[in-house]
């Protein structure tokens, strides 16, 4: 005998009817599982209420400070990394740094002066530190803004 579409029914216990409270003395009637008297019996208690103990939002410290929404953030590249990635030197742009995986695309790049530079590099970046500029110029190179 083949199963027809109208013969299908859910497994026993798959669809359990929800308890309808407050619908007569025999089944969770009268107080409907809320107990007698008090806030919980009369109205709903806020979800964040912790039973009279110190609320969680008051346990957390009051952090001060200021977050500047207009701060410009740079991806940094140090001179030792520039020399490691470009041992022959030459002209280096942000696109070159992106292609070797030193920085991400479409973001500002700043060169910092950690490490030594022995090759001549002509960097085209968004920003640089004073120490980086001194070391680059000492090695015979230059830094220009893109």
Swiss-Prot record:
Region (Disordered), start-end ranges: 1-46
Any one biological process term the GO annotation gives: translation
GO molecular function: rRNA binding; structural constituent of ribosome
GO cellular component: cytosolic large ribosomal subunit
Keyword annotations from UniProtKB, A to Z: Ribonucleoprotein, Ribosomal protein, RNA-binding, rRNA-binding
Record-linked InterPro entries: Ribosomal_uL15, Ribosomal_uL15/eL18, Ribosomal_uL15/eL18_sf, Ribosomal_uL15_bac-type
Compositionally skewed regions (Low complexity) per UniProt: 29-43
Assembly information from the UniProt record: Part of the 50S ribosomal subunit.
Family: Belongs to the universal ribosomal protein uL15 family.
The name this protein goes by in its record: Large ribosomal subunit protein uL15
Native source species: Cutibacterium acnes (strain DSM 16379 / KPA171202) (Propionibacterium acnes)
């Amino acid at each position: 005998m083949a199963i027809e579409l109208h013969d299908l029914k859910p497994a026993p216990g798959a669809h359990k009817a929800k308890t309808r409270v407050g619908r007569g003395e025999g089944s969770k009637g009268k107080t409907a599982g809320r107990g007698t008297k008090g806030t919980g019996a009369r109205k709903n208690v806020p979800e964040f209420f912790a039973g009279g103990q110190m609320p969680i939002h008051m346990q957390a410290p009051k952090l001060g400070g200021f977050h500047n929404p207009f701060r410009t953030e740079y991806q940094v590249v140090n001179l030792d990394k520039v020399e490691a990635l470009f041992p022959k030197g030459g002209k280096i742009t942000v696109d070159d740094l992106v292609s070797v995986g030193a920085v991400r695309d479409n973001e500002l790049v700043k060169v910092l002066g950690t490490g030594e530079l022995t090759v001549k590099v002509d960097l085209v970046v968004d920003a640089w530190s004073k120490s980086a500029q001194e070391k680059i110029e000492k090695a015979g190179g230059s830094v220009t803004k893109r």
